Amino acid sequence: AYVEKSCILKRAVNDIVLSKSFDNGMICASEQAAIVDAAIYDEVKAEFEAHQCVIISKKADIAKLEKVVLNEARTAVNGAIVGHSAIEIAEKAGLKVPAGTKLLLAEIPDATMEHPLALEKLSPVLALIKSDGVEDGFKKAEGMLNLGGIGHTAVIHTENEELQLQYGIRMKACRVLVNSPSAEGGIGNIYNNMIPSLTLGCGSYGHNSISHNVSSFDLLNVKTLSKRRNNIQWFRVPTKIFFEKDSITYLRHIEADRVMLVCDPGMVQFGYADLVKRNWNLTAIDQQ
């Protein structure tokens, strides 16, 4: 989720905590990182702490958390901690946290493989990344998607409607949520009009056949009985066609510089078509 400086800060932080703590972070659509503009970074951190979240900043503590949360050999989450509470995970990592801790937030500088906690964690563990502004925030959000989430879900918290549109266009995600908790928003219906589902398509970005939330409709075999029909076939004809004997004399009374003369090849061969053209000062004549 990208948290831009114009957002309603308290709502944005509440949404992220609500989303990431729901079902202990097991919803695949939940945030894996909060990318926060530098202008509001300290204020956002304080708000997270007010929501019983613990900020982990020391490199040694982050390294301990990485070892417990991730299987770095597989660049994937450690299955042993999936769905566990923040307190249980902290204990496994040898970190002391207060009772009632909802989330563990690890401060990392960027969304790259050099910082494994940017990967999908399926737990109440969230990366916290500072951005230098909109462009940097967008790039880091793209980096998050490229770390195994391409085609899935992206979130922006901002009151700037132009940025909402730009973010939606730029992110390679099939669900782009605005000012919403990612887990509850991504699975649909509660915060938007998307189809409620726990199976989310990632489109061609993620090598999926569909890009929407999977529902019972996708399980139906829809038959089509198609009866034969001919497509419309037509051709344009002149508004007037003169065909009786001596009708060529009507050219004296018609204001036209282009006519089509229908005749046999002999009429052309012996020059009669050219004679008509000269006598009536026609600049062009189609001979058929």
Region annotations inferred by a language model:
Residues E43-A50, Q166-R170, G271-W280:
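Short, aromatic/basic amphipathic alpha-helical patches
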Residues C7-R11, I35, A39, E43, ...:
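Conserved active-site and cofactor/substrate-binding residues in soluble primary-metabolism enzymes
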Residues V36, I56-K58, L104-A106, L177-S180, ...:
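General beta-strand structural signal in soluble alpha/beta enzymes
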Residues I232-Q288:
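ATP/NTP phosphate-donor binding region
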Residues D37-A39, E107-P109, H157-E159, C263-G266:
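Structural motif
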Residues L95-N231:
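Conserved C-terminal structural/oligomerization subdomain of aldehyde/semialdehyde dehydrogenase
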Residues A1-T112:
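ALDH superfamily catalytic-core signature
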